[in-house]
Design a protein with these regions (language model features):
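Nucleotide-sugar donor-binding/catalytic module of glycosyltransferases
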Residues: 1-223, 230-231, 243, 249
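Low-complexity, charge- and small-residue-enriched intrinsically disordered regions
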Residues: 241-259
Length: 259
């Protein structure tokens, strides 16, 4: 029921009539861009090219939705728009339910503040899964090479870590956990990464975790260089002046007692 959006649909060599159904449903609606790949590109490369096709503004919100999953209800986009306006955030994660069990997914939960403060996301357990949303200005600052594996190819598995870690590190306290269920993760799909090659998945995860961290883009006033801004220096100077007056009075009174 939220109308102000643009949707890039990419058919990655599907083997059924998905493309024909999608084409019929979005025909004539300029909000949709429908792409039919002629070669298999897999998730991350499709997301990378899909964002480019969307041609977003810096403040636009990007949402990733896997083709075999779905939103939990028709109000998700409205919910997210209101949430971003209220929280003034740059990135959100969570929450999702597993299909067909209906259980809440375990890989989306609140990141501890100490992890945010130290940007130690890569050392902490993975907990920023579906639903993943972020401002384009964060995405645009990710180095392309950090989306590529040691062979120079887009990550085939654990690809969400390759872009979420950099954006979490850049966003800092501008990231938010959403407790409400917005996403349904289809565990019935036999092609889920952990079902295909779990050993390879773990290997790629470690490779991504070992990459360099990104600097925070948030001015939270806690870094040393921020303490020298004119307004903070003014406060510091006043405190020093007050302490100096107290010290002089203390010395004067002490000397008076000695006399």
């Amino acid at each position: 029921n939220y109308l102000n959006f643009k949707c890039v649909l990419i058919d990655d060599i599907s083997t059924d009539n998905t493309y024909e159904i999608a084409k019929k449903m979005v025909s004539g609606d300029e909000r949709f861009i429908l792409v039919k790949n002629t070669e298999k590109k897999l998730a991350l490369k499709n997301i990378y090219e899909g964002v480019q096709l969307a041609n977003p503004n810096q403040e636009d919100i990007i949402i990733t939705l896997d083709g075999d999953d779905w939103f939990s209800n028709s109000n998700v986009l409205t919910y997210l728009n209101d949430f971003y306006n209220k929280e003034d955030c740059w990135l959100t994660y969570g929450s999702y339910a597993e299909f067909p069990s209906g259980k809440k997914g375990k890989f989306a939960k609140q990141i501890p503040q100490r992890v945010v403060d130290t940007r130690s996301y890569r050392e902490y357990e993975w907990c920023t899964s579906h639903l993943r949303t972020f401002k384009y200005h964060l995405w645009s600052k990710i180095k392309k090479e950090d989306l590529l594996d040691s062979q120079g190819e887009f990550y085939r598995m654990t690809w969400d870590l390759s872009f979420m870690f950099p954006m979490l590190e850049m966003a800092g306290n501008k990231s938010r956990y959403i407790q409400d269920i917005l996403y349904v993760y289809n565990l019935d799909n036999p092609l889920n990464d952990h079902k295909v090659d779990n050993i390879y998945q773990v290997k790629l995860e470690q490779e991504i975790r070992n990459k360099n961290k990104y600097e925070s883009l948030v001015d939270d006033g806690t870094r040393p260089e921020h303490l020298l801004r004119h307004n903070r220096f003014d406060i510091a100077a006043k405190l020093i002046f007050i302490k100096d007056k107290i010290l002089k009075r203390y010395i004067s009174e002490t000397l008076g007692c000695l006399e």
